[in-house]
From Swiss-Prot:
InterPro entries on file: ApoC-1_sf (IPR043081), ApoC-I (IPR006781)
Gene name in the database record: APOC1
Protein name in the entry: Apolipoprotein C-I
Record bears the keyword DNA-binding: no
Superkingdom of the organism of origin: Eukaryota
């Protein structure tokens, strides 16, 4: 799962970093740009991790999983009863 998420993230970050400065900005040296890549990747990873954890916690605390489970149980029981009456 981590590899599945990390590869697209790495591609996006590298594209953003290697895109270059805007025309109004001074051109930084390549070595300083390449030296900042690891810290930018770490910062981006930490931000992404925090947002993912917050989303998971929000889902855990909501009643959506319980409602979904109840709906599937009720639907399954209805189908089971209909099959019982149809084949008996």
């Amino acid at each position: 799962m981590r590899l599945f998420l990390s590869l697209p993230v790495l591609v996006v970050v590298l594209a953003m970093v290697l895109e270059g400065p805007a025309p109004t900005q001074a051109a930084p040296e390549i070595s300083s740009t390449l030296g900042r890549i690891p810290e930018k990747l770490k910062e981006f990873g930490n931000t992404l991790e925090d947002k993912a954890r917050a989303a998971v916690e929000s889902i855990k605390q909501s009643d959506i999983p319980a409602k979904t489970r109840n709906w599937f149980s009720e639907t399954f029981n209805k189908v089971k009863e209909q099959l019982k009456t149809a084949f008996s």
